[in-house]
Amino acid sequence: MKKPAHNLLTAFLLLWLTGLTTACGGDDYYYPDILQDYLTAHSGADGRLQTILTDDGTLYDVLNAVIAPDETSDTTLRIVANYACEEDGVGGQGVRLYAAQTTVSPLPLPADRFEDGIKTDPASVLSIWMGLDYLNIVLEVKAGGGDHTFHFVEDEVRWDETAARREVCLSLYHDAGDDPQYYTRRAYLSIPLAQYATDDAASLSVRFSLLNYEGEEESYVFEYIEP
């Protein structure tokens, strides 16, 4: 394959927003309880996001108009978003998105699928945790305004027949090109894992590795959480 195009500047979704504050007469204002999370969103036929699924398994309708990148219809997107839960007007509860962007979430590929080889430029893990069908990662990378390309390398998949256990070893593909290290930026990644949790696996562990700025390999191991 050609060099994967999952850049540091991931797509920002178009939002038509109401104000964050609502006047309740005089000087009284209501400030909604804003949450920030990784979410799985689905767009409808018109390219607008219809629903979001939280990592605790709760499905909500999206109450405001949010357009998927390129107005892509009938697709599933992994996003990181600021949102608030609100009554939907018919006795239920939905969410209003105040800011959202897609995450870097390609399916991991074996090393031989990268025609130009594996790029292992360093990055720092700010946070990493297991979500619903995804491993969520917030990276800090040193940048100077140029493009950084990310992907995930499937290094090894081991199967224990006796225990019906699958162990998956993944690593970060990071190509910083010639970008100078002037300042630090964040990158939001979320590795899809459902393809490894097939019916024959009673359990699944995921090992994720990357090179840090000290030139050392860091590894993190998680147990997959069944939906």
Where are these regions (language model features)?
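C-terminal motif of bacterial Sec signal peptides marking the signal peptidase cleavage site
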Residues: T18-A23
